[in-house]
């Protein structure tokens, strides 16, 4: 009898929830909201994200349009999938959408938004961005690390030359190069060869790609605890803070003459030279931004560029011809040579178009109600810009939008530095990535040296997945399988 009563109560609860859900759905249809696919009770549209959300959301946008409203649990999410719609959000109404939503994972790792990429829109964010734009990633600062880039590229070339008769794990070589450059620039020394550092970075990258159920359905937050996410967050945040604190303290105890980001930020903290105070937590958060924003995404672009070139040997041949013609009898490619390499820049653009390192840009959040293309967007709406979908939009790129064809950029005005929303791998507007020049110059000079020094081919025993463009899961999307190649 008791069991029967419990079953009846459970059924009544389910019926009541379903009735309330459909009533709310009906009310929502009367408001002037963007088109939205049908939602399930409680989780709403969460089940439609799939293994690769950028692909799933792109497919949904073909049916519901470039401005599409989803609900992840209790959170309204506006998905933007076209260049015109992105212009409305990132340019026309840039200020309204300039903030960032809170996230359990990001808050725990990035010191509750003390960094630049994830800080809420406001005075603190403006101050930290000015430090990055005017100092850390200024053209002068980027040029000052030219020798670091050249030294690490020379070491990479020598390593490849020694292994020239063997199958080379190009993915591993590229990630090691990127790690070494960024560690030297940001921290003043290499850490990439240390197993504990590599493990820390792998755990960080993996965790940033996790999905926190509790961030969207608060009453299901216990699921994050059950599956170990909360424990992993505590562990990784403590390990990262311990590592960064040790690095900063080593600089404090040193002679103060290192030319790296930590030393520069400590000088600002000590001398108060920028008109506002910067503390130890802010320093650690900004350095963490450099690792997350540059390390994984930079090597990912290089990996995809070499993948596409090996898949399209006519493009590889053309790039190689250009690089060798510009450099002629030089032993290597210098950064001064890059300005004359138009096809190289086209290859970088085309790779960014088809394989933006962050297919779904870091989410934005509306701070006020706003009218967007006759749709009402309330304050507190999360906004996801699908850079992957925008880069493959046939209306912009033509019927061959899915094909790798660098030639399309040779006479094109479209650029990736924020002026044109047809190509937004680094974002646009107020929240555009401040480190574009820092990342792109490394990508260009590495790729140019790779094709200048060696003739590349796939191993004879290469299986189909070597040239497959299957993607990994996570925040930054790289190849599912490592890229192996040989030099001839």
Swiss-Prot record:
Membrane topology summary: Single-pass membrane protein
Q: Has UniProt tagged this entry with the keyword Metal-binding?
A: yes
The places in or outside the cell where this protein is found are: Membrane
Keyword Signal recorded: no
What cellular-component terms does GO give this entry?
membrane
| Cofactors that this protein relies on | heme
The record's EC number reads 1.14.-.-
Which positions bind heme? 433
Q: Which SUPFAM superfamilies match?
A: Cytochrome P450
Please provide, alphabetically and separated by semicolons, the GO molecular function terms listed in this UniProt record: heme binding; iron ion binding; monooxygenase activity; oxidoreductase activity, acting on paired donors, with incorporation or reduction of molecular oxygen
UniProt keyword terms in alphabetical order: Heme, Iron, Membrane, Metal-binding, Monooxygenase, Oxidoreductase, Transmembrane, Transmembrane helix
Q: Which family does it belong to?
A: Belongs to the cytochrome P450 family.
Q: What PANTHER family does the record tag this protein with?
A: CYTOCHROME P450 71A2-LIKE, CYTOCHROME P450 FAMILY 71 PROTEIN
Protein known as: Cytochrome P450 71A24
Kindly list the organism's lineage: Eukaryota, Viridiplantae, Streptophyta, Embryophyta, Tracheophyta
């Amino acid at each position: 009898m008791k069991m029967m009563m419990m079953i009846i109560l459970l059924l009544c609860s389910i019926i009541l929830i379903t009735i309330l859900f459909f009533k709310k759905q009906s009310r929502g249809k009367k408001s002037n909201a963007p088109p939205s696919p049908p939602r399930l009770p409680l989780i709403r549209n969460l089940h439609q994200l799939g293994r690769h959300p950028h692909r799933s959301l792109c497919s949904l946008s073909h049916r519901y349009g470039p401005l599409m409203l989803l609900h992840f649990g209790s959170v309204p999410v506006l998905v933007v999938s076209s260049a015109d719609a992105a212009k409305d959000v990132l340019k026309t109404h840039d200020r309204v959408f300039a903030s960032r939503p809170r996230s359990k994972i990001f808050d725990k790792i990035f010191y509750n938004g003390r960094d630049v990429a994830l800080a809420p829109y406001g005075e603190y964010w403006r101050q930290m961005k000015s430090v990055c734009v005017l100092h850390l990633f200024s053209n002068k600062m980027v040029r000052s690390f030219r020798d670091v880039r050249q030294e690490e590229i020379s070491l990479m070339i020598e390593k490849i030359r020694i292994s020239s008769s063997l199958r080379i794990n190009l993915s591993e070589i590229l990630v090691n190069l990127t790690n070494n450059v960024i560690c030297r620039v940001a921290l003043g020394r290499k850490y990439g060869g240390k197993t504990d550092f590599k493990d820390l970075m792998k755990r960080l990258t993996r965790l940033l790609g996790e999905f926190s159920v509790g961030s969207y359905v608060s009453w299901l937050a216990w699921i994050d605890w059950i599956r170990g996410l909360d424990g992993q967050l505590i562990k990784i945040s403590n390990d990262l803070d311990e590592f960064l604190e040790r690095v900063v303290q080593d600089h404090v105890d040193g002679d103060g003459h290192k030319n790296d980001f930590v030393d520069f930020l400590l000088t600002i903290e000590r001398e108060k030279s920028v008109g506002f105070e910067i503390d130890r937590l802010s320093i650690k958060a900004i350095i963490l931004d450099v690792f997350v924003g540059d390390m994984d995404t930079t090597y990912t672009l290089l990996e995809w560029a070499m993948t596409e070139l090996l898949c399209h040997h006519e493009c590889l041949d053309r790039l190689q011809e250009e690089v060798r013609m510009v450099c002629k009898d030089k032993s290597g490619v210098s950064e001064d040579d890059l300005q004359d390499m138009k096809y190289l820049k086209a290859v970088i653009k085309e790779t960014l178009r088809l394989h933006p390192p962050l297919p779904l840009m870091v989410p934005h959040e509306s701070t006020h109600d706003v009218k967007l293309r006759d749709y009402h967007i309330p304050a507190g709406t999360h906004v996801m810009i699908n850079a992957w979908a925008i880069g493959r939009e046939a209306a912009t790129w033509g019927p061959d939008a899915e094909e790798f064809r660098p030639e399309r950029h040779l006479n094109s005005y479209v650029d990736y530095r924020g002026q044109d929303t047809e190509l937004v791998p680094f974002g646009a507007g107020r929240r555009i990535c401040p480190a574009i020049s820092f990342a792109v110059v490394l990508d260009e000079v590495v790729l140019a040296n790779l094709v200048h020094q060696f003739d590349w081919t796939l191993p004879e025993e290469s299986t189909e997945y070597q040239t497959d463009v299957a993607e990994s899961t996570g925040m930054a999307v790289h190849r599912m399988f490592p890229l192996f190649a040989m030099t001839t």
